[in-house]
Amino acid sequence: LFQKKINFHNLGYIIIDEQHKFGVKQRKNLSDKGGNNCDVLLMSATPIPRTLIMSIYGDMDISIIREKPKNRKEVITYSKLESKIKDVINFVKKEIDNGNQIFWVCPLIEESKKVDHESAVKKYKYLNEIFPNTVDIIHSNIDKYKKEEILSKFLNKKFSILVSTTIIEVGIDFPNANVIIIENANKFGLSQLHQLRGRVGRGHKQASCILMFKSNLSENARKRINILKNSNDGFVISEEDMKLRGFGDLLGFKQSGLKNYKLADPIHNADLFKLGEMEILRIEKEEKNINRYKSLLKLYDQADIINDII
């Protein structure tokens, strides 16, 4: 769809689901195919910082659906040192005894000499020794038909634990899966962790997410884990993500990055920006004599206004 050689006849409406999966340039290339009369709807459980700040600046209208589907409970999120894996195994045993299923997510398929991350294959072998005949594995190197077979078996409760890479991040719906364990959680971004956590809690039972980490956590990684533990709201998580990572370049293609402001900061003064947007709309609709704002507009055009104020 993004390729130049693909043209549309009278493209008028574009819906982009999981918008954080696409780059700024990709989204722009697609919307350009519709011209000036094309409407674009972006959908995501966790908007990227750049999208969030555009809504604050008034460049994008935003609708928030905060209600969960009926009978769904909040996912309880825990954090656990990887050295305490025996506690996690005991928890998993109880969940299996209660008829529940588990996702176990690892960042890599195979072990890497360069990166000290837990691999899915290694974890599969480890869990298969503890829970024989109740574990299977899925990752991107498995062919399409085998993946479908494994997922079908998991859906029909043929086994209890599915070890996986982040391939399950989107498009997976298994109501009986009530636990997700994420290895090396400190290596994932907030949006990805929230998306992975969303794979559980789709039934009526209480669901749990366990974020496993090594002892040498960075300050930002510790903040990310605490944010996930304290909130299930994707919009709140996106706001916190924006505070940590910044929002990038609004006029370019960078989707994150911190900016310095001498006056109002759109991250910490979001309410002020919204108030300003509402006032601009009111002036456009109600004010007939724009001349009363000449002095203000003149100040705005002066390059040294900020230095003068400070």
Report each predicted region and the residues it spans.
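Inter-lobe coupling/hinge segments of SF2-like helicase ATPases
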Residues: 1-226
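Accessory helical-bundle/CTD segments and flexible terminal tails appended to RecA-like ATPase motors
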Residues: 152-161, 168-175, 180-183, 198, ...
